[in-house]
Amino acid sequence: MKLSFIGGGNMAQAMVGGLLAKKSFRADQIFVADPDAKARAKVSRLLKRGGQVSASVRDLRGLGSLVILAVKPQAMEAACREGLADRLRGEAVLSIAAGIRLDSISRWLKGHARLIRCMPNTPALIGAGITGAFARPAVSRAQRNLAQRVLQSVGKVVWLDDEALLDAVTAVSGSGPAYFFWLIEQLEAAGVALGLAPGVARELAIQTALGAAKLAARGKDSPASLRERVTSKGGTTEAALEVFAREALGERFRKAVAAARTRGTELGDILGKDA
């Protein structure tokens, strides 16, 4: 069983590295095509002497059982039309490009139906991501399982029954890391304003976020229960949360996430147009 990556950028490199580290695939089972010499050099270092790395999909010895489209959204149409469309037979095609709908990819691939679309996030670059995925009905169970193996190389995977929900996934987990980075920034700034040294404030904010996430990830208690456990009646945490409530922070946050979802839908309309 072999895989081919069309695009060898950061996310493709993370997946290749994860697959090799977990011994899910050998280097000689992985093919990568990317016109950028620097990207090819990085992938080649990962694969060492195994697999094949080329400048064009036309030069690959084969496509394997799964083709991963790992190019930027703006380059997706060209990647599909130039060399790939004419080589596809029964392979499954997995797109990790944000915003590009499967209707557009199918059109650029001359009606190819075995398509999977997913939305990873940046923590995937360190193997700690989560990916939302949707598979069209023509994708076989074996092909879906193969896609799952690939995506699990960089974190967890959740499958959706409706492609349109990927816009919500993008708003929650795709953009989500930025929300948490912003919150860390604010907590750090608040600590500095209270007299803490910047380095100390940053370390406190980051480790608190990390520890809280680990507690929540255990799944034994809901985030609400964990919050209530920290919040003593008349205490310091309650004083802070009362300010959040007065300022309607929760409602504003939900509006922000909804705005991200709306923009994702708009970008799908824009990016899916033929050049």
Each model region followed by its residue ranges:
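NAD(P)+-binding Rossmann beta1-loop-alpha1 motif at the extreme N-terminus of oxidoreductases
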Residues: 1-62, 66, 192-194
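Hydrophobic packing residues within well-ordered alpha-helices of enzyme cores
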Residues: 15, 19, 40-43, 79-83, ...
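Small-residue helix-packing motif on alpha-helices
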Residues: 30, 40, 60, 197-204, ...
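Rossmann-like NAD(P)(H) cofactor-binding subdomain of soluble oxidoreductases
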Residues: 31, 47, 57-133, 137
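Internal alpha-helical scaffold of NAD(P)-dependent oxidoreductase catalytic cores
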Residues: 104-114, 130-168, 179-220, 263
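Short pre-catalytic strand/loop immediately N-terminal to key active-site residues, enriched for Gly-Thr
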Residues: 165-171, 223-228
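NAD(P)-dependent Rossmann-like dehydrogenase/reductase catalytic/cofactor-binding core
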Residues: 206-275
